[in-house]
Amino acid sequence: MSDAAALHPLIDANISTLASQAFRKRLRADEFLLNDHRLGDNRILPGAAYIEMALSASELALQGLALPLSGDRPVLSQVQNIKWRQPIMVASDAIERDAIEIAISLAPSQGGLDFEIYRAEGEKRHVYGSGRLCEETSPQPEPANLQRLLTNGQVYQRNDIDVAFKQRGFTLGPAFQVLECLYANAEEALAELKFPDGLQITPVVQPFILPPSLLDGALRTALGIGGFSATTNTLDVPVALTRLQIFKPIDGVCYAYARRDNAHGSTATTASYNIDLLDSIGNVVIRLTQLQTQAVPHLGMRSLRAAQNAKPAAPMSAGSAPVAAASVIAATPRQQSGAPPSREAVVNTLIAHVISVTKLDAGDVTASGLLSNYGLDSMMILGLNEKLSATFGEVTQT
């Protein structure tokens, strides 16, 4: 389907039936949402785009238009229980032949709408993200004290910020280079949101309810809390968001204010943040509550094509270490009333999950093969962690 016929940059067509409400999108590598947002060589749809897709789909379903009238909020201005389950990755040459077709479904739920973003494969759904939309009835929050935030912390300029995120594996084009300046201390960070000079702003802002470029910048502001380490071997990826509230139209956003969510704590590999998008005088435009991130290894940074074409390593010899010890995932079996699970049981379970996720033949996955050989990315690894935890207990990153 041509861009001219699209209902929204993230929705090409309404594919609803009498039984279900759904919309379709065909993603190509040359779209700015993918071309300007990469981790390593991989074009990855930003998590912020999942939220925009849900908001615009709900407007289409309820109002018949993808965007609310100028100056209005969406009918459903709160998004709850957002889960980013898998990344949507598109190969660099996926112009038409290899473009990925995804869909979003909507289902009524307690006065709101549940949504699911997925790729259909026959009767099966590969789910990338989910959540719930509902009305926003909370009063306008108190404004932030911009004067305090602008004078309380270390200052990072655009070039410093761009270098810091490049070190973390991000390859961002102009549409996502929105952090002009960042003021950070140990507990909070304030970022000035501004597109680089020379960028045509209209295509990346005007067609959206919540422009993914700006929301992505707000999410990355949280990673600047405490300053930027000179070296890092992990990526902090968003995995869940408890609530997003829209109080005003997005037009006037100038700052992103992030702070640690100490009420919900953090660990060596997880963290929780609260983030506000603010206008020029500190009024809250958008509020994000309990953004959960997880630190994952720099895996999945190879090109998607290379990962898909990679051959597994040789079968494990008698003395080889299991894949769970290959500096990617370490499983600690839960102690049961009887003897703890054997190493073989853990390895066999992990192999079965890898086969399930990648759809490779059983003979192509070996215990000695690095997870990156099988095209696994960071979010898939998180999924493996969850499955191992459900089977054996606590799973830690190493």
Segments predicted by a language model, with ranges:
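Short alpha-helical segments that sit at the start of domains
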Residues: P340-V347
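Low-complexity, intrinsically disordered or signal/transmembrane-proximal segments
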Residues: Q335-Q336
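Phosphopantetheine-attachment site and its flanking helix in carrier
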Residues: N42-S56, N348, A362, G369-V395
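A broad, structural micro-motif
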Residues: S77, V239, V365-T366, V395
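Acyl-thioester-processing domains in fatty-acid/polyketide/NRPS systems
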Residues: M1-A324, V328-T332, E344, G383
